[in-house]
Amino acid sequence: MSRFIPIELHHASRLLNHGPTVLITSFDEQSQRRNIMAAAWSMPVEFEPPRVAIVVDKSTWTRELIEHNGKFGIVIPGVAATNWTWAVGSVSGRDEDKFNCYGIPVVRGPVFGLPLVEEKCLAWMECRLLPATSAQEEYDTLFGEVVSAAADARVFVEGRWQFDDDKLNTLHHLGAGTFVTSGKRVTAG
């Protein structure tokens, strides 16, 4: 007898998506307004030059800012940022500055000056939005080229994650406000 049970299709993505939850930051130079949102779906898509994909619904203010200004930040929150991550992913920033609302301190990115977060977080990237593709319209997927990146030296060692301290670990959203952290490193061979 099989131990497998049917999964409702609206939960099927959760079977694959246990990668790190990220915070997407954006800034409108004209109005001087900034925004931050949580996103469960992001991934690298090219090594050279480094390029990434993020999924941001076209109805969001974040998407408007990114498409208007052509740039965005990706912040990788740590366990200590769980409450921030859930909060900024649960409300729109169209009518309020979520950085101020939740007391999230900001650092400025070195290339675009994007709002980024280091406190309670493990890494960040500044990205330039790549020209629109059909995936952008059909699937809400935006592609960006990474122009600057930094990571906490306690957890990113010699080009890879090293999660020896449970408090310095990435968050992985399982849905409905439930998160897990990364496991222990296992080496093949």
Curated annotation (Swiss-Prot):
Flavoprotein keyword on record: yes
SMART domains in the cross-refs: Flavin_Reduct (SM00903)
TM spans (from-to): none
Superkingdom in the source lineage: Bacteria
InterPro entries documented for this protein: Flavin_Rdtase-like_dom, Flavoredoxin, Split_barrel_FMN-bd
Pfam families, alphabetized: Flavin_Reduct (PF01613)
Keyword tags: Flavoprotein, FMN
Entry-linked SUPFAM superfamilies: FMN-binding split barrel (SSF50475)
Named cofactor requirement(s): FMN
Single GO MF annotation: FMN binding
PANTHER family associated with the record: FLAVOREDOXIN, FLAVOREDOXIN-RELATED-RELATED
Family: Belongs to the flavoredoxin family.
Descriptive protein name: Uncharacterized protein YddH
Gene: yddH
